[in-house]
Amino acid sequence: THMCVGSTVGPNIFVKICAWSTAQISRELMIQVKEEFGKLPRKIKLLNCVGGGSSAMGFWNEFMDTDAEFIGIEAGGPKNSKLHAAPLTNGSKIGILHGSAQYVIQDSEGQIGRTESISAGLDYPGISSLHCYLKDTKRAKYTSASDEEALNAYQMVSKFENISPSLEPSHAFA
């Protein structure tokens, strides 16, 4: 059998392959930041939505050896609901999902729990082992945005920037 996955989750080799391939995002960002400012600013804060974690890893990769501050925003689910897709910010415990130890949403028996988010791309019960490490070592901070906050951010960005972001980055805009 073979596992095909499009995020930085699962056994280590899949995490490495996906993180390497998405790192082009941060390589390009590093070039653009240096062109804009002449050098890398002393203070830089990089925010990104986090589901499985590949987008954020791609965005942050080239900045890991700098003093950049990383903030990941998970899917907090609907307000007034206990369901969410935010294992790092809602007290989830370590479990095994897709062959990897990670923070994972679990039910009372330790089975994979239900999730809910307006954003299909963030609606995942686990999180990359890389993000678990970044959280535990305090290299990155994590928070969550509710479905309603993401929708409000979507409307504001659409109105003021004249672009229509997907629901995933709308969580980060919130």
Predicted stretch roles:
Residues 25-29, 59-63, 154, 172-174:
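Buried hydrophobic packing segments
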